[in-house]
Amino acid sequence: MIEIDTRIHDRYSIELKVGFVTRKKLRMNDFSLAMWFFVPGSLDINRATYPKDMFYQDVKSNIRLITPVFLLREIVEGPALPLRNIREAFIQMASNPTRTLISEYEYQIKMFAAIVKSALRDELAHIKQNRIGSDTETLCDGFIRNAGKICDEYVGLRTIINAPTVPEGVMRMYLSGDEFICDITCKHILELIEWLRGRKLDELAGKATALYRRIGKHMRQLGYPEIRKDDRLHNRIFIHRFSILKKYIESDLYLRAPKRRDGVIVEQLYFSIAAGLAMLFATVVSFAFQKKFGSLTLPLFIALIISYMLKDRIKELMRYYFAHRVGSKYFDNKAKIIHKDTELGWLKEGVDFIEPEKVPADVMTLRNSSHLTEVESGNVTAEKIILYRKSVHIDRDKLQANSEYSFSGINDIIRLNVTNFIKKMDDPSVLMRTLDDDGSIQTVDCDRDYYLNLVLQYQYDNTAEFKRFRIDLSRDGIKSIEEVVG
């Protein structure tokens, strides 16, 4: 299964979180993803102005394991795996702080904090999407209670490692996890408070506020920074610190994927064939003229010059032909997906400009299914079409090896910076005039936007699915991303 989530990452970047979820009973899992970008022709994006190297500079891809899924109540109630694992790691490390046990202790801190972060996010999203009004109070009360219990349970672990056998640096690992859990819990509690107040659920908002203040008191006691009103310098440090903490906590989930060119051996083989055929042509011409006119004659001399001129052209033309064939069959880059020195699988990626007639009918039908104007429906051919494709292979057995947790797959977090797309846009606003009801002429400031259409074609287990998104852009950056239902 492939799960796709889109959002605006920043003013000039869109983010696609692509989850490649493996089947439990299938060892080898293969996925394919094609992203069709329909770019307005007025932006002057084409092969000459936007080569492959520039596209890959604009695209950033992070590969990471999908965080194991637990409910908040599962983390704090009964024999919960995350809490049990972290407690056992703390006890063993405190008794015998060897390098191996310290490494396991740090790993369990990171996993526990990452699992809590995902659980808070998912349950808050569920509360907001809940349509059964009578369940709202129970869901919110459970969220507040369980979030508070998780913080208390983690704080209680400190007594296990606050021992003379534990080095100071090891305690700092614990405190980093504590600070991150406090920060992320407060962030989601604030979001819940705002949501509750908007629905006049003041009693629940009061409970959430009490938890927020309790966590804040704990943070101040341990010297963790908090957001302060009218203190930009302090808040700058807070943002930087939180960003570093987030990277530290999630570092064990990220996978290495060193890239290299795909199809290099086949490409060189084709190029060698091209050189050989060109040389064969020159040799045949040389032998033919030598046989007819003899050696050291003027006709032979002229024939040799012409044959070598044509040989180089034939060689280049055949190199171009073979390169096109290799490019259509192979990808630009290939990377091994590696976690803790274990190769979990591989991924391939490729990008190219595609002519409209070569776009699959299903993709073009979805692109044409909804237009903002009638004129646009006949103007699709003026768009430039970029195809970015990925192929992913995952070995599920290796994915599950050497871990107490069950990982369902990997996330490929793709960020596309659109700075090169907006270089040739007109000003973001234009002054237009209209006649008011009283007959006066009014000047109105109007937005000038451009629309980038993205069609996703993803395939797994012989099943193909499609999604379309409309990205609203202006000279000032990205305004919105909306899914267009065909």
Residue ranges and their predicted role:
Residues M1-F242:
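Soluble regions of membrane-associated proteins that transit the secretory/organelle pathway
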Residues I4-T6, I14-V18, L33-M35, E349-P356, ...:
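Hydrophobic transmembrane signal anchors and adjacent membrane-proximal interface regions, especially
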Residues F20-V21, D30-R73, V363-R475:
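Structured extramembrane domains adjacent to transmembrane segments
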Residues R131, K329, N333-D341, S370:
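A sequence-level detector of short, solvent-exposed, charge-rich linear segments
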Residues E194-L277, F281, R468-S474, I478:
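Membrane-proximal, non-transmembrane alpha-helical segments
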Residues V264-A335:
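Transmembrane alpha-helical hairpins and terminal membrane-anchor modules
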Residues K340-V380:
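Acidic, Ser/Thr-rich low-complexity segments on the non-lumenal side of membrane proteins
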Residues S480-G486:
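Acidic, serine/threonine- and proline-rich intrinsically disordered appendage/tail regions
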